[in-house]
């Protein structure tokens, strides 16, 4: 419409169709007309209009989130803290975010909790792959798969695009349902993450394969608890990578083999490469039980 456009900077009114002319060696003309996607709407107003900090910084407290259902009724309206999430994904132009509500709340039909994430899916032009992977995992016997709903996100009045609003992986009766670990116990429960970023306070590399294990919940453990898990992982890897012990099936004494098989099938069918690094892959061990793969 005769106004020079600077990507990510120029503000336009799309209440009416807008015509763009793009010139390279050839001139192209496009008319853009926006339509409502029919998805739930998420409006975040940050405290003082501040920029959302990265995951390595403190939460931006004093912010507010309002979520509208598809029929425009209010699903949730209340205070929240917000910051970025992800490691490599935080470096992309479309940022992923984490929300920490002031109190537990049911969001878009998902069970009550304080912690939620907004996945940007920037590398996926279909925007579907995470949700399809979740759907596939839900069809297996895996103990828990995060629930999620597609939404349109607005931050301080700016439309950020399509996001997947889903549950953050946490120990909870409606999420990773394991016992909380008491100080005097060592057997469980534990939520462990394997991640090459290796950025949690309590962590170790396994003795046989050098894999990066981190304690996600509890995020602090005493010496006895730390050593229990470290030795357990060592015994598991020794049973896996000793030819005779593997042939005898000794590794099955240390893991819930059905969950490991289901989890690996999902990884293979969806082409997820995260186990290769590894990044953001999980297992959990309940009191008296074997480690279970996932979510």
Regions found by a protein language model. Give the residues of each.
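Phosphate/dinucleotide-binding and metal-coordinating scaffold of catalytic cores
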Residues: 16-17, 22-295
């Amino acid at each position: 419409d005769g106004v020079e456009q600077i990507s990510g900077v120029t503000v336009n009114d799309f209440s009416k169709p807008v015509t763009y002319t793009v010139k390279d060696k050839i001139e192209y003309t496009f008319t853009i007309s926006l339509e409502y996607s029919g998805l739930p709407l998420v409006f975040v107003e940050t405290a003082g209009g501040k920029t959302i900090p990265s995951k390595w910084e403190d939460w931006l407290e004093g912010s507010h989130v309002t979520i509208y259902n598809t029929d425009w009724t209010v699903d949730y309206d209340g205070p929240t803290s917000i910051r970025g999430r992800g490691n490599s994904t935080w470096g992309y132009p479309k940022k992923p975010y984490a929300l920490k509500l002031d109190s537990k709340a049911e969001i878009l039909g998902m069970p009550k909790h304080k912690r939620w994430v907004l996945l940007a899916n920037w590398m996926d032009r279909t925007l579907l792959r995470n949700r399809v992977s979740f759907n596939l995992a839900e069809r297996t016997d895996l103990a828990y798969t995060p629930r999620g709903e597609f939404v349109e996100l607005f931050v301080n009045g700016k439309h950020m695009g399509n996001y997947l609003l889903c549950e953050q992986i946490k120990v909870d009766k409606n999420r990773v349902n394991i016992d909380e670990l008491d100080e005097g116990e060592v057997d469980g429960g534990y939520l462990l993450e394997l991640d090459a970023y290796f950025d949690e306070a309590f962590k170790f590399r396994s003795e046989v394969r050098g894999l990066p294990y981190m304690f996600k919940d509890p995020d602090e453990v005493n010496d006895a608890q730390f050593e229990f898990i470290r030795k357990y992982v060592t015994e598991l890897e020794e049973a896996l990578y000793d030819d005779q012990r593997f042939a005898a099936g000794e590794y099955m004494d240390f893991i819930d083999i059905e969950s490991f098989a289901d989890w690996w099938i999902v990884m293979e069918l969806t082409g997820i490469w995260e186990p290769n690094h590894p990044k953001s892959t999980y297992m959990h061990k309940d009191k008296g039980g074997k480690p279970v793969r996932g979510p």
